[in-house]
């Protein structure tokens, strides 16, 4: 259903819009035979078709849960911009920063003004911007006339990460900045496609400001892990993840540059898909870059596939999506997410990411859960290619191909092999050295593995400033026109336990050139090496941990990097454009926490816990069908997803 058609229906309904009293009565309705908690897309649509609930009733059911669970989850003695302290079992998560409700409906539901659709248009009466309840009412009216759903996502209630443009809701990437109009002029392409498929955009999700690190933004505040509100909920897309985990929405849309879809999904017992980068448009994304991609976060593999079906494909506004032309399957992605067996599928085990000898006590239990996942895949009929607990799947293959393909990065990584003079010019014949290594890969340093393949640096310069300025130029706001304006016309939180956002913007501003050549070379090198390694072993997919580190306490020190393992999980393969899906793999029951001690830190434990762990499945670019086959079979056999116990069903209202 197009936006224009929705607007027409909403206009016809305006005379009959609920008053505040009637809206409150609607909020108290509970439809027999349907519960929104853990409801899948199929379950929601079947309930609508069977007239167990209306689309408006679905939205209201989620709003009741938002009322109950979306409050502040930390102590803020100096206000939203000051230092925070965690609250044990807070019963709140602060996942959603903006609600798609007109002022009258927002007041009737008891939400404060900071959750308004716009802070620059507090009247908010434009008829071409129906709110979520009005859109739902329009769907109900259309369904009453035709008996058919308006589209494949009819009744599906979504949250969108605040990094993405929504024409009817404020978009600031978590910043408390002085936009003349905090609403962008149009939807991001993928948001428009979701609406056209019938999805109802209920909220903008809180995020780490400007989609960097940490569970905090200057406008939205701190958000928390629903499985332990004293802990971080993942990376920048964690507001999206926690909203889905606590059943505040059906699914949400995240963004991933490093692990920002997969890590929040893993620690919130969700399915998170970081698709092939060129498959989904990045149009309307604040701060897009070469490694950024759009993906769904849902409670089931099938739901993630249905959302991908709605927005995947070429978009002339994002030239990278040209690579997706003729690369989508002829049948829907959702049709692949129905497997029960994996006979004939060859899956390689990335033991490089699972070594008990190389990592720390903090990694132990998660490694055990991934080993159990490998055993489950074998039971499902998959052919498991496993180098063994002490082995590494790709190290020999990497030694053959990486030095030549990564050349300059490889030379920087091993200066003893490739000495330079004081002017950084080659001090010896590097070509001769590379040829020798090609002829005899045993001479390649043994520490060159999948863990260290990018240690020579695959970075870019100027991206942070370039992409923000490009986005703001296209947005055309009268006040905020550049990264420099974001520095001078915004307020920033100040807390030593979280990254300094103003400092990050100032650092980005110092760039005067855009250079992505090294990143592009690294991307080509990693893709070529891994595709060749997979082909040599006839692998359809790979399995690995998403992360082996439990989420830390919100104000605790980070676990230090060890042998290539970072405190936020394994990111190399996904960063280079391979599609990766994270699926719940169980719960860590006994963990180790990093705490400050004097001028350093130490591990304490074991600590009793019940924290979700995720397993990653990785496929070749554009082979999402293989991912959905493996993930759906594993999900069906294991059913590890559990909702957070402190965010259960609400009491029935009389």
Residue ranges and their predicted role:
Residues 404, 551-567, 592-600:
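Short, surface-exposed loop/helix-turn segments at secondary-structure junctions
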Residues 21-23:
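Boundary at the C-terminal end of the N-terminal hydrophobic targeting segment
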Residues 7-17:
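Bacterial N-terminal signal peptides
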Residues 87-90, 99-119, 126, 130, ...:
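Short glycine/serine-rich loop/turn segments
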Residues 68, 196, 245-359, 367-383, ...:
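Structural helix-boundary/capping segments
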Residues 25-172, 176-180, 210-212, 321-330, ...:
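Short, well-ordered alpha-helical
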Residues 59, 137, 187, 332, ...:
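Acyltransferase
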């Amino acid at each position: 259903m197009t936006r224009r058609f929705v607007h027409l229906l909403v206009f016809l309904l305006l005379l009959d819009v609920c008053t505040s009293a009637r809206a409150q009565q609607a909020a108290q309705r509970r439809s027999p035979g349907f519960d929104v908690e853990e409801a899948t897309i199929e379950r929601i649509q079947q309930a609508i078709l069977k007239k167990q609930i209306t689309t408006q009733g679905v939205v209201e059911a989620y709003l009741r849960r938002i009322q109950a669970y979306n409050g502040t989850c930390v102590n803020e003695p100096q206000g939203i911009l000051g230092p925070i302290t965690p609250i044990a079992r807070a019963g709140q998560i602060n996942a959603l920063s903006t609600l798609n409700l007109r002022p009258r409906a927002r007041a009737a539901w008891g939400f404060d003004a900071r959750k308004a659709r716009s802070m620059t248009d507090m009247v908010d009466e434009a008829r071409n911007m129906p709110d979520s309840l009005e859109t739902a009412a329009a769907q109900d009216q259309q369904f009453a006339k035709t008996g058919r759903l308006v589209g494949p996502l009819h009744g599906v209630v979504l949250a969108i990460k605040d990094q993405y443009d929504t024409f009817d809701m404020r978009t600031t990437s978590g910043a408390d900045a002085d936009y003349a109009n905090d609403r962008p002029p149009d939807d991001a392409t993928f948001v428009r496609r979701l609406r056209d498929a019938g999805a109802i955009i209920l909220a903008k999700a809180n995020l780490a400001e400007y989609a960097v690190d940490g569970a905090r933004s200057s406008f939205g505040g701190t958000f928390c892990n629903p499985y332990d509100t004293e802990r971080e909920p993942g990376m920048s897309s964690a507001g999206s993840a926690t909203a889905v985990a606590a059943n505040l929405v059906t699914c949400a849309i995240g963004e991933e540059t490093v692990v920002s879809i997969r890590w929040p999904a893993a620690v919130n017992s969700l399915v998170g898909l970081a698709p092939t980068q060129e498959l989904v448009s990045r149009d309307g994304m604040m701060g897009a870059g070469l490694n950024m991609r759009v993906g769904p976060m849902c409670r089931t593999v099938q739901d993630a596939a249905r959302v991908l079906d709605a927005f995947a494909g070429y978009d002339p506004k994002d030239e990278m999506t040209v690579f997706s032309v003729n690369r989508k399957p002829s049948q829907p992605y959702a049709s692949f997410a129905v497997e029960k067996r994996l006979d004939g599928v060859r899956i390689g085990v990335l033991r490089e990411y699972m070594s008990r000898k190389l990592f720390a006590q903090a990694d132990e239990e998660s490694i055990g859960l991934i080993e159990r996942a490998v055993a489950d895949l074998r039971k499902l009929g998959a052919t498991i290619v496993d180098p063994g607990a002490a082995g590494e799947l790709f190290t020999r293959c990497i030694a053959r191909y990486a030095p030549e393909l990564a050349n300059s990065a490889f030379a920087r990584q091993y200066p003893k092999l490739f000495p330079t003079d004081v002017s950084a010019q080659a001090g010896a014949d590097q070509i001769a050295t590379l040829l020798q290594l090609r002829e005899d890969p045993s001479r390649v340093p043994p520490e060159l593995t999948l863990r260290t393949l990018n240690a020579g640096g695959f970075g870019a310069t100027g991206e942070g400033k370039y992409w923000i300025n490009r986005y703001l130029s296209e947005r055309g706001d009268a006040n905020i026109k550049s990264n420099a304006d974001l520095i001078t016309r915004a307020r920033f939180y100040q807390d030593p336990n979280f990254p300094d956002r103003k400092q990050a913007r100032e650092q980005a501003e110092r760039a005067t050139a855009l250079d992505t050549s090294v990143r592009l070379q690294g991307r080509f090198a990693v893709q070529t090496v891994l595709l060749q390694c997979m082909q040599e072993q006839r692998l359809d997919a790979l399995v690995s941990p998403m992360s082996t580190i439990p989420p830390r306490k919100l104000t605790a020190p980070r676990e230090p990097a060890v042998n290539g393992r970072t405190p936020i999980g394994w990111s190399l393969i996904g960063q280079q454009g391979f599609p990766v899906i994270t699926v719940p793999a169980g719960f860590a029951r006994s963990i180790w926490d990093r705490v400050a001690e004097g001028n350093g830190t130490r591990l304490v434990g074991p600590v009793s816990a019940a924290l979700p762990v995720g397993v990653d499945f990785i496929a070749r670019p554009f082979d999402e069908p293989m991912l959905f086959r493996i993930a759906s079979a594993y999900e069906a056999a294991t059913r590890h997803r559990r909702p957070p116990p402190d965010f259960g069903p609400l009491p029935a209202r009389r």
